[in-house]
Structures are given as C-alpha cells and as structure tokens.
UniProtKB/Swiss-Prot annotation:
Keywords: Cytoplasm, Exonuclease, Hydrolase, Nuclease
Subcellular compartments: Cytoplasm
Gene transcribed to yield this protein: xseB
GO MF, one annotated term: exodeoxyribonuclease VII activity
Transmembrane segments: none
Organism of derivation: Methylococcus capsulatus (strain ATCC 33009 / NCIMB 11132 / Bath)
GO annotation (BP), single: DNA catabolic process
A cellular component annotation (GO) from this entry: exodeoxyribonuclease VII complex
Catalytic activity: Exonucleolytic cleavage in either 5'- to 3'- or 3'- to 5'-direction to yield nucleoside 5'-phosphates
InterPro entries: Exonuc_VII_S (IPR003761), Exonuc_VII_ssu_sf (IPR037004)
Protein name (database record): Exodeoxyribonuclease 7 small subunit
Keyword Lipid metabolism: no
Amino acid sequence: MARKPPSFEEALTELEQLVERMEQGNLPLEESLKLFERGIELTRTCQKSLQDAEQKVQILLEENSLPTLKPFRDEP
C-alpha cells in the first residue's frame, strides 16, 4: 500500500532533521546519499504544498473580487 504523503509541517520538520544530521559530517557516504534523496522528496512535497496554497489564495481573492497578489520579487 502506498504511503500517504506527509503534511507540509511534517515534511519540513523531517527535512530540518535530515539537514542537521548531514551537517554533522559523520555519516557514511551511502547513508548520506539516502538522506539526500529523501531530502529531495521532502523538498518537492513542500514546494507542491506551497504552490497549492498559493493557488487557493489566488482563487479566493478572485472569487471575492479582491485585488490580486503581486510577486514579492521578480519571478522568472
């Protein structure tokens, strides 16, 4: 059975823990690679959650005829 993706908060917490472990610098190469791979998965999960939240906010603003959001910084 497929594992349920973690919530944004769960993914971010796990990602922070992975970074902390890797920054200690005492992991074997193979374990570091596994943690790095997991970190990439968690980063993608967090990015997807943030994109979904941004879209929901945009839809709500449009539905309520509120001014649309402008990018905080130049986005490509």
